[in-house]
Amino acid sequence: MANFRGKRINEEVRKEVSDIIRNQIKDPRLTAMVSVTQVEVTKDLRYAKVFVSLFAKNDEEKEESLKALKSSAGFIRREVGNRVKLRSTPEILFEEDNSIDNAMYIESLLNKIKEK
């Protein structure tokens, strides 16, 4: 959704999903710190791809946290539907956002080059 309304919907859904994850999800598998970086809602409002950054001790903890989010998708969808007034509530699809990890890796490479 590239138009102004689409951007507003993306931002509103991002804000609400972030709040729901922070305050209402009580899954014990969700041990990683979760940050919702971006949301892309399709034009027909059927799907919302939610990109999350997971800060965890190891990869196993990240995987468990992502599984917990995916299993909570129905609850999150219902809560978003109650908070955001849309024609239809989009189905929530979680994707891991590795952009922060990639940026840190590139920065470490640049620091190594700088040292040489």
From Swiss-Prot:
InterPro entries: KH_dom-like_a/b (IPR015946), RbfA (IPR000238), RbfA_dom_sf (IPR023799), Ribosome-bd_factorA_CS (IPR020053). GO terms for cellular component: cytosol. It is found in: Cytoplasm. Keywords: Cytoplasm, Ribosome biogenesis. SUPFAM superfamilies: Ribosome-binding factor A, RbfA. GO terms for biological process: maturation of SSU-rRNA. GO terms for molecular function: ribosomal small subunit binding. Monomer. Binds 30S ribosomal subunits, but not 50S ribosomal subunits or 70S ribosomes. One of several proteins that assist in the late maturation steps of the functional core of the 30S ribosomal subunit. Associates with free 30S ribosomal subunits (but not with 30S subunits that are part of 70S ribosomes or polysomes). Required for efficient processing of 16S rRNA. May interact with the 5'-terminal helix region of 16S rRNA. PANTHER family: RIBOSOME-BINDING FACTOR A, CHLOROPLASTIC-RELATED. Belongs to the RbfA family. This is Ribosome-binding factor A. It comes from Clostridium perfringens (strain 13 / Type A).
